[in-house]
Amino acid sequence: MIDIKLIRQNPDFVKEALRKRGEDPAIIDEILKIDADWRATITKTNELRSRRNEISKNVARLKKEGKNAEAEALIEEGKRLGEEIKALEEKEKELQKKLNDLLLMIPNIPHESVPVGEDESQNVEVRRWGEPREFDFTPLAHWDLGPAWGLMDFSRASKLSGSRFTVMYGKLARLERALINFMLDVHTKEHGYTEVWVPHLVKRETITITGQLPKFEEELYLAERDDLFLIPTAEVPLAALHSGEILEEKELPKKYVSYTPCYRREAGSYGKDVRGMIRQHQFDKVELVWVTTPERSFEDLEELVKDAETILRKLELPYRVVSLCTGDLGFTSAKTYDIEVWLPSYNAYKEISSCSNVTDFQARRGNMRYRRRSDGKLEYVHTLNGSGIAVGRALVAILENYQQPDGSVRVPEVLVPYTGFEVIP
């Protein structure tokens, strides 16, 4: 949620930010209109309360003086004021809800360093690492390799759950588990993250804090009986962990890592990446979340990206880093880097991690603040998030980039201590 003061003081700046994102800026005028009405209602209510308090004092005085008729007249006026105040209080609540509902629909303001563009075609490549492998044979896609070994089963997954699910057996199931443990070990032992085990079901308030609600409810799985949402990413419980809290500056930054399955309806992705494991309703991910100060959050974002890159470098998978343009930014993000791994089946780089600074956007929704060391003043924290990395896509990248002419796949050296084997199948 962006600061209402920013909209009041600089509406043209906010409108321009929305235009850069490809959003309609008309909502800002609607917000300003409701905000003006809301503040005028508060002013009127306070004036009437003041008058009612004055009447109460005068009634007591008049009764002491024996002026009962005058006192009764004021009592009647006080009753009328009470009814007016009650009506204004109801109006104030309604206007505040309308205002809040509209504010929840406004995306974050892009940082000045974000390239301006309409869509992903205008994202800017920042760097590359490694070279795509040149095969001296025709490489197979992961959706051909896995089933050929009898270790990846899409048909039984469909029988169990429908489309966009996968069953894996034996060495592939162990490779998935090995990747999870490897990533957690790197981030906790080398990068200084605290591992957190989080709930996979969260309250509506929690997932509103992190920005998935109210705008993207159709993308989420909802357990209606208890009004709990399956998490689309561990970012949700991690970023909301300190909601309603005041942290001390000396505690920051906090660096959290969590492995969870992630659940997404992918309602808007019909027809995209329909084969294989690239776009699933359920997938594994290791997530990185920082809670930090405004002064250092963009510097911290660069470090978070490098932490995610380390995983791909250790796996020796070629990748590139791109800075998302304004038109491709996620709803909550002020700045995002995508890390894309090379997949031979697509002959292209595909996203395997998205790392974002959401500034104080989630902190305002969740009232997450810290006390400054210098003067004791309370300020909103900044939160960052990033995949460190998507496990299923890492498995896919290994299968496709490490395959051999005989149809087998060599396991990356760093994973062998975790798998206990060097070749699949």
UniProtKB/Swiss-Prot annotation:
Q: Which GO terms describe its molecular function?
A: ATP binding; serine-tRNA ligase activity
GO BP, one annotated term? selenocysteine biosynthetic process
Its pathway?
A: Aminoacyl-tRNA biosynthesis; selenocysteinyl-tRNA(Sec) biosynthesis; L-seryl-tRNA(Sec) from L-serine and tRNA(Sec): step 1/1
Q: Which GO terms describe its cellular component?
A: cytoplasm
Q: Which residues of this UniProt protein bind L-serine? A: T233, A234, E235, E287, S387
> What is the enzyme's main class?
ligase
Q: What is its EC number?
A: 6.1.1.11
Q: Which UniProt keywords apply?
A: Aminoacyl-tRNA synthetase, ATP-binding, Cytoplasm, Ligase, Nucleotide-binding, Protein biosynthesis
InterPro entries reported in the protein's UniProt record: aa-tRNA-synt_IIb, aa-tRNA-synth_II, aa-tRNA-synth_II/BPL/LPL, Ser-tRNA-ligase_type_1, Ser-tRNA-synth_1_N, SerRS_1_N_sf, SerRS_core, tRNA-bd_arm
Q: Which SUPFAM superfamilies match?
A: Class II aaRS and biotin synthetases, tRNA-binding arm
Q: Which reaction does it catalyse?
A: tRNA(Ser) + L-serine + ATP = L-seryl-tRNA(Ser) + AMP + diphosphate + H(+); tRNA(Sec) + L-serine + ATP = L-seryl-tRNA(Sec) + AMP + diphosphate + H(+)
Q: Which residues form a coiled coil?
A: none
Member of which family? Belongs to the class-II aminoacyl-tRNA synthetase family. Type-1 seryl-tRNA synthetase subfamily.
Q: Which NCBIfam families match?
A: serS
Q: What is known of its domains?
A: Consists of two distinct domains, a catalytic core and a N-terminal extension that is involved in tRNA binding.
**Protein name in UniProt:** Serine--tRNA ligase
Question: Gene behind this chain?
Answer: serS
